[in-house]
Regions:
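Short glycine-enriched, charge-decorated loop/helix-capping segments at active-site entrances
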Residues: 55-56, 175, 213-217, 277-283, ...
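Terminal RNA-binding accessory module
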Residues: 350-441
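Short, acidic/polar
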Residues: 318-324
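Short flexible coil/turn linkers enriched for glycine and charged/polar residues
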Residues: 148-151, 161-163, 260, 270, ...
Length: 441
């Protein structure tokens, strides 16, 4: 491998594929580069490219490889580093490609700048991937509070998963449950709020189990209880949580703390008990529905969104119709639907009765059509009502922001400032969100 040259001004560019946890990891690694003298690249020309890969589906794998090849063709002299799930699971793929200089997975990312510098004179790609199943501690990184100030920050507080759903490759990519120390998370959030951030979204692979491995009383409830005490933090939003891990204490906090958004993302994955059993999901429909009823009774106006997989091995048309009926009954305000992806190394990949791609595609479409109508009905209830919108960014002369319920609202930008929570009267419902006007005294 020939020596890579460094321009006088060191620059780095990040390409992030996949989930919000990956986005946080990229932001944290970018912070490490900035603290070591690098500047974020302007435009499409950098000395170093870091591709944070995704492997949740085979599409994620393919996009990761395509991105490496595209960057190498366009920038033959740049250093290319890969991180993330695909790099963790299949480092040999990137070694054989010949286009990658540094390979890290989900550990030792705190040393990524050091690896990049070594790669400039290395003869072979540096493979720094370790056995993630042996890693017991959370790798603490943080987003630079001195960087670009936005309104909403995604903060990772937990890593890894111990559930081992039969369809999912992520436990093998991110390892066992690992929680961030509560004081580290609170410290980072305080710094970001001091810089002007007004909303934090707590994220993790298995967020509902946050703190269990620390054995010191830390929990998601204890963390949220500390965060509500931060004066200028206006909103706390929770990332995806498994329904079986939603504690009574956390429900009480959502019920009583105005800063905690009335929105929960509770993955259901299927509306058929036989499919849930095959997935090794730790609940059945009766339990899930009972929780939904309890939540709606205790927290009026609560928005509920979910994840759904269609075309799981053995899912019959009858099973799928059960799922559609379940969705009609629960009426989520939003559904992220995915076709099942056969991931080598997972139990479900070897199951008989794999569903064809054509059937999976058709079922995705049927769910999307159903969801479109239900989500529109949900938004319609807000027409003429006043909601609270945290102004985030200007687009074409209009400000955009989110309601408590995770609905995007567009408002005229005149007199509006970013980072302010405005009362907004909804004047129109659109295909993707709502339009409103600020209510003045």
């Amino acid at each position: 491998m020939e020596q890579k040259k460094l321009s006088q001004k060191k620059t780095v560019s990040f390409i992030t594929l996949g989930c919000k946890v990956n986005q946080y990891d990229s932001d944290a690694m970018r912070t490490l580069f900035v603290r070591n003298g690098y500047s974020p690249a302007e435009g499409d020309d950098a000395d170093v490219y870091v591709i944070n890969t995704c492997s949740v589906t085979s599409v994620g794998d393919r996009k990761s490889r395509q991105m490496v090849r595209r960057i190498r063709r366009a920038h033959p002299d740049a250093i290319i580093a890969v991180a993330g799930c695909y790099a963790q699971l299949a480092p040999e793929v990137f070694e054989k490609m010949g286009d990658v200089d540094v390979i890290v997975g989900h550990q030792n990312r705190t040393h990524i700048v050091e690896y990049v510098e070594k790669a400039r004179t290395a003869e072979q790609p540096l493979n720094e991937v370790v056995d993630i199943m042996k890693v017991k501690d959370f790798e603490n990184m943080e987003v630079d509070p001195e960087g670009e100030v936005k309104t909403r920050a995604f903060i990772k507080v937990q890593e890894g998963c111990d559930n081992y759903c039969t369809f999912c490759i992520i436990p093998y990519a991110r390892g066992k449950l690992k929680s961030r120390k509560q004081e580290d998370a609170v410290s980072e959030i305080r710094k970001l709020v001091a810089r002007g951030y007004r909303e934090v979204v707590l994220t993790g692979i298995h967020l509902g189990n946050y703190g269990k491995d620390l054995h010191d009383g830390t929990s998601l409830s204890s963390l949220v209880s500390e965060l509500v005490k931060i004066p200028d933090l206006l909103r706390i939003r929770l990332g995806s949580i498994e329904s079986v891990e939603l504690s009574e204490e956390l429900i009480r906090i959502i019920q009583n703390e105005p800063k905690v958004c009335r929105h929960l993302h509770l993955p259901i994955q299927s509306g058929s008990d036989s499919v849930l059993k095959g997935m090794n999901r730790h609940y059945r429909l009766a339990k899930y529905k009972a929780l939904i009823t309890e939540l709606r009774d205790k927290i009026p106006g609560l928005a509920l969104t979910t994840d759904l997989i269609v075309g799981f091995p053995g899912e019959t048309e009858e099973n799928f119709k059960e799922t559609l009926e379940t969705l009609k009954e629960i009426r989520f305000s939003g559904i992220h639907v995915f076709p099942y992806s056969q991931r080598t190394g997972t139990p479900a990949a070897t199951y008989p009765d794999q569903v064809s791609n054509e059937v999976k595609k058709e079922r995705v479409h049927r769910v999307q059509e159903l969801e479109k109508g239900i989500a529109k009905d949900y938004r319609d209830q807000f027409l003429g009502k006043v909601v609270h919108v945290l102004a985030e960014e200007v687009k074409n002369g209009w400000y955009e922001g989110l309601t408590d319920e995770y609905i995007r609202v567009t408002i005229r930008s005149e007199g509006v400032e970013r980072g302010i929570l405005y009362p907004v009267r909804i004047t129109a419902i659109t295909e993707e969100g709502m339009v409103g006007e600020v209510v003045t005294a």
